[in-house]
A protein has these predicted regions:
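N-terminal membrane topogenic signal
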Residues: 14-29
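Transmembrane helix-loop junctions and nearby membrane-interface residues
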Residues: 38-45, 72, 91-101
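Soluble catalytic domains of enzymes that build or remodel membrane lipids, polysaccharides, and related
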Residues: 116, 122-136, 145-344
């Protein structure tokens, strides 16, 4: 006497077990990604832990891809759909087509090309020889530094930086508030942003491009916000608000440095939305598709890298050859690009 039914039932149960396991694993990956995605999608002033977690949003694409693969193996349609929607959101945020882009200039508009670099030197600890090498090897014409100290200034002078970039406006300080601008072009101090613990100087750079026979005026802000940690998060938001007000001013604006924020923070995106006449500013790194080219931390704790150093311009300025370069002695990477600045 045979009993085929139980055998079939046992086979189905055996097949169902791995399907359930894959689905559970997919769910375990989906839940935290979905939670962070809600915070990312809603632009409000989130509390400190959420603000810090949002910095790592780009990395969420990896568990989302894995969740989708597990959902397919688990053969749960609702899980496949959920994972697909989450993956689409991560890709949209990773490569945002609604981000600010450089505006095309009218035919015949003269422009001046400038090679620029920015570096947070981490309390002046960055290797001076590497900095000077980057300037020399890449033909850099404008260098901006944060956390600039007297010791770093002395080492850079010994390495010959002032021969390459003879114009400079420096405010060295042994705490994190120091800053410096080195240039081949004449520099004029315009002031500084108000009510910021770290000095954020505004400098007029009188750019000239002999090859193109053009000149342009660039208003440079050396950005260094307080980080969003402990009770300093309110000042971080205030600093970004001050930067936004500067960005709304007329003329060619370059706001470059350590924002201590990523594109995934609504506070930073609010800065990008504050361009003159309501136009969007351009984050050169985001425009170059470099959201997976972290600028911090280059040293120290083994955290997933994030992009907190930015080169932000008004939309009439275009950028090319954006890159991130590591500098020994600093936990930040240097960011570098060539800017095309309209005359005027």
């Amino acid at each position: 006497m045979t009993h085929p039914a139980p055998a079939v039932s046992e086979t189905r149960t055996a097949r169902r077990r791995p399907s359930v396991v894959w689905s559970v694993l997919a769910l375990l990956l989906v839940l935290p990604v979905a939670g962070l995605s809600i915070f990312r999608a809603v632009p409000v002033e989130w509390p400190l832990p959420v603000v810090q977690l949002l910095s790592f949003t780009p990395w969420m694409v990896l568990p989302t891809v894995l969740a989708l693969l597990l959902a397919v193996l688990g053969r749960r349609a609702w899980m496949v759909v959920t994972s697909t929607v989450l993956l689409a959101a991560q890709l949209f945020w990773l490569f945002p087509f609604d981000a600010g882009k450089a505006e095309p200039l009218s035919a015949g508009t003269p422009t001046a090309a400038v090679k620029v670099i920015s570096l947070n030197s981490e309390y002046g600890g960055a290797d001076a020889a590497t900095i000077v090498g980057l300037v020399r090897d890449n033909g850099v014409q404008l260098l901006v530094m944060q956390e600039f100290t007297q010791g770093l200034e002395d080492r850079l002078r010994s390495e010959g930086l002032e021969t390459l970039l003879p114009q400079h406006l420096n405010k060295p300080n042994d705490d994190a508030s120091g800053g410096a601008v080195y240039s081949v072009f004449p520099l004029e101090a315009e002031g500084q942003l108000p009510d910021t613990p770290f000095t954020m100087d505004v400098t007029r750079v009188l750019v000239a491009d002999p090859a193109a026979g053009s000149k342009a005026t660039l208003h440079l802000t050396n950005v260094h916000t307080l980080p969003p940690v402990d009770d300093r998060i309110a000042q971080w938001r205030s600093d970004l608000g001050n930067i936004a007000r500067q960005a709304a001013r007329p003329g060619n604006q370059l706001l470059m440095g350590d924002y201590n924020s990523t594109y995934d923070h609504s506070e930073f995106r609010a800065v990008l939305d504050s361009g003159p006449d309501g136009r969007k500013l351009v984050d050169a790194g985001t425009a170059a598709g470099a959201r997976f080219s972290p600028t911090w931390p280059m040293e120290g704790p083994p955290l997933p890298g994030i992009v907190i150093d930015h080169m932000v311009t008004t939309p009439r300025i275009s950028s090319s050859n954006y890159s991130v370069r590591q500098v020994p002695g600093s936990d930040h990477a240097a960011i570098m690009a060539t800017l095309s600045i309209p005359a005027g």
